[in-house]
């Protein structure tokens, strides 16, 4: 019985991957690359781009936000995939 419970515990930990935090780039436009650990079980990184009076702007971070028309967005699900 103890072996069965131990096996179930190990399988649960492996399947849930407890303690895993997605890592996303979070630098803006042409800044040097930086990363951040996402919180709250976030499973996406994003890269958002648009043009304004300063030129083409880029924003990166955790999540996959909704955007207005004219703003490009790319969402992805692996570590540092939004560079």
From Swiss-Prot:
Tissues where this protein is expressed: Expressed by the venom gland.
Annotated Pfam families: Toxin_cobra-type
Name of the molecule in the record: Alpha-neurotoxin NTX-4
Phylogenetic placement of the source organism: Eukaryota, Metazoa, Chordata, Craniata, Vertebrata
Signal sequence extent: 1-21
UniProt feature coiled coil, ranges: none
GO molecular function, one term: toxin activity
Function: Binds to muscle nicotinic acetylcholine receptor (nAChR) and inhibit acetylcholine from binding to the receptor, thereby impairing neuromuscular transmission.
Protein family according to the UniProt entry: Belongs to the three-finger toxin family. Short-chain subfamily. Type I alpha-neurotoxin sub-subfamily.
PROSITE patterns, per the entry: SNAKE_TOXIN
Main localization of the protein described in the UniProt heading: secreted
CDD domains: TFP_snake_toxin
Cellular compartments per GO CC: extracellular region
Family matches, as InterPro entries: Snake_3FTx, Snake_toxin-like_sf, Snake_toxin_con_site, Toxin_cobra-type
Organism for this UniProt entry: Naja sputatrix
Keywords on record: Acetylcholine receptor inhibiting toxin, Disulfide bond, Ion channel impairing toxin, Neurotoxin, Postsynaptic neurotoxin, Secreted, Signal, Toxin
Cysteine disulfide links: 24-45, 38-62, 64-75, 76-81
Subcellular location: Secreted
């Amino acid at each position: 019985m103890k072996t069965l419970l131990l096996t179930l515990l190990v399988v649960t930990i492996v399947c849930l991957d407890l303690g895993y935090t997605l890592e996303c780039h979070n630098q803006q436009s042409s800044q040097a690359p930086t990363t951040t650990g996402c919180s709250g079980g976030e499973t996406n990184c994003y890269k958002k781009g648009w043009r304004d009076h300063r030129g083409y702007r880029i924003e990166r971070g955790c999540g996959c936000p909704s955007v207005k028309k004219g703003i490009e967005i790319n969402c992805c699900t692996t570590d540092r995939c939004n560079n």
